[in-house]
Amino acid sequence: MRFSDTPGQEGLKDSLRRLADNDTVPHAILLSGAEGTGKMMLARAFAQYLHCRRPVGGEPCGECPDCRMHAELSHPDLHFVYPIVKREKEKIATSADILPLWQQMLVEHPEMPSEQWLEIINAGNSQPSIYVNEADSIVQADSYPPFTSPRKIFIIWRPERMQTAAANKLLKVIEEPMQGTVFILVSDNELQLLPTIYSRTQRFHVGSIENAELTEWLIHKRGLGEDEARRIASIAGGNLINASRLASHSGETEEFRLQYMEIMRQAYKKGAAALKKIADRLGDSKGGYGREKLRRFLLYMGRMARENYLYNLGVGSLVAMTREEEEFASRFAPFIHSGNVEELVKETDRARIDIERNANAKLVLFDFFILLIILIHKKRG
């Protein structure tokens, strides 16, 4: 993993490089920020940079034995710690017991969406945790000298999921580890960390990614055209996970545009019966969109509400729509205004969240479509 694999965050990347280059790496670093900011990718890049034998231009060389082991997720001095669901019958007690699943996650979903991890480990209704057994394993692993590198690195993903007993057991080793040991904590919510753990780290906030930086990443790393990359970056809202998901389904834009137009036309005509049919079709458990595709479609609808409002205001420089989307906006945008845009966006987000939580898709969509009828006929504020 290279620093350039993560879009944006240039100031943070420079700070991490300086720590390594000046040999001032602290015992424990905390990278914290919202999900989708590329924190784990940065942690992995920093770990590889620390292990690399001949870094070039502020990046790991990618060719030395240490870099090759990082690429294969097999470096003996890189340890990953992550929340698991303990299962005694399957003899699952620590991270190492499901290492192949973790490696699958890193390869297939390097942006680290938490919901994907729950699916991979088949968590069901259980909440993954970092247990006290894990702390025992960390303390033991820290007692051994590094194998091939001057540094031994522990990357702890979602340390806020650590049980109190585990956190207490790790306090001493995080504060006074063996020489050469570095802990990198990667947290979605630093406020949930045990204060005694939090206070022992050097902290770096990882913010959302600028649209221009996401656009460049989508062009150069995902092979999208400039227009499509710009649209996806606008929809993603600075979130790398959203951008990656949308890029994987970039061919859906035209399908979503046509479906959006039909829904809004029927809402304008107060066609409740037609909207009921659309809700039943899209929400059907067998032939419909499915939960993930519905999620992406509702993200698209939310963006269209915002874009049509901006178009209505006459600020074309801020609008990120295709020619076909603008053509529809030229006729429909007057119905999205200051009197309803906030509620439109809020209700679109509410429908998306309900579907993410496995609510009945047909009912959620139909309720949402009926609200659309009310909202687009609402007078300006």
Which residues does each PLM region occupy?
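Charged, glycine-rich active-site and insertion segments that engage polyanionic ligands
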Residues: 1-49, 55-57, 65, 179-182, ...
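Short, structurally constrained coil/turn elements
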Residues: 72-74, 177, 197
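Residues immediately C-terminal
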Residues: 161, 176, 192
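Structural recognition of the conserved hydrophobic beta-strand(s) that form the central parallel beta-sheet
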Residues: 153-157, 170, 181-187
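Clamp-loader machinery-focused feature within the broader ASCE/P-loop NTPase space
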Residues: 2-165
